[in-house]
């Protein structure tokens, strides 16, 4: 027996490779009734039996999000059958209408295909795309005298827009705020012959064009006004720049101290009151000086320097012993420091009597060195 020829005897019939699927073929038209834009692809069916005439317009989104603003109805797309499949099953289908035709109150809504209760419920849930300023302007423009009171504006909004019937407190406060803050609405007092409560509100003639499309367009400031504000701010920043201001420095020659001729007044040196401690210190230093002068040897230069320092200290005391007025006593240490640091005394300065007694006479040996 030839093993090569054995698989040829067990060949499967050709009909068993492609079994029929009658059930799936029958389901495709039924699915077209419920799935409008759904394409069910079957790989076992011939492509000639499939409709491929879909267009982009069938999948476009409606530009207007509100149903009652007047958009076209639902577009039916063709399915597998030559006739287009309806959006609703045939048992419940009805002739399609445009959702909203133009009406006087809302700018377009013909809900004849819905019951009255369904229409009212739909309008209560959908908020009108108008601002509160636009609602006020619409109510005033539709009035005969072009003026309304606050209660009449409330009544107009509630009657023409059912959305505002459910919660009156919130939107009524917004209406009042817009009337008081918006410059386009002017308050008119009542006449004497017109009894009633509340003033009238009217629309400014200069703002009528701001409500052309129903919505309120905010009024822009003129360019000249904005330019003037910018120039004023720049001038203020230039005159007094922030962060660059420094506190005024206190100088000895302030404008208050200047004389009428423009020269500053120089105060005289104040007096210094001496304590007994300072007197004892001077006496001890004099005693040390007299003791060192008696020594001989290499300490002669040191004795000379100490003698000069003592003479400078005595000159400081003698120069400040002049009597001065009491108003200069507080600043005595500030104006009278320079004589203290001068080590060489002047010839014109005289020592007080009590200091002359403390200093001994210099010997002729050291007088020649000066």
Swiss-Prot record:
Q: Which GO terms describe its cellular component?
A: nucleus
Q: Which SUPFAM superfamilies is this protein grouped with?
A: Winged helix' DNA-binding domain
List compositional bias (Low complexity) regions by residue number: 349-370
* GO terms classed as biological process: anatomical structure morphogenesis; cell differentiation; determination of ventral identity; ectoderm development; nervous system development; positive regulation of DNA-templated transcription; regulation of transcription by RNA polymerase II
Keyword field: Developmental protein, Differentiation, DNA-binding, Neurogenesis, Nucleus, Transcription, Transcription regulation
Q: Where in the cell is it found?
A: Nucleus
| SS bond partners | none
What's a single GO MF annotation on this record? RNA polymerase II cis-regulatory region sequence-specific DNA binding
Upregulation details from the record are: Induced by Bmp-signaling. Suppressed by Wnt-signaling.
DNA-binding region range list: 127-221
Q: Which domain of life is it from?
A: Eukaryota
In residue numbers, the region (Disordered) covers 1-28, 212-269, 342-370
Q: Please give the tissue specificity annotation from the record for this chain.
A: Initially localized to the animal hemisphere (the presumptive ectoderm) of early-mid blastula embryos. Becomes restricted to head placodes, excluding the otic placodes, by the tailbud stages.
Q: Where is the composition biased (Basic and acidic residues)?
A: 232-245
Relate the protein's function as given in its record: Transcription factor. Essential for ventral specification of the early cephalic (head) ectoderm during gastrulation, playing a role in the non-neural versus neural cell fate choice. Binds to DNA via the target sequence 5'-[AG]TAAA[CT]A-3', with 5'-ATAAACA-3' being the preferred binding site.
What is the official name of this protein in its record? Answer: Forkhead box protein I1-A
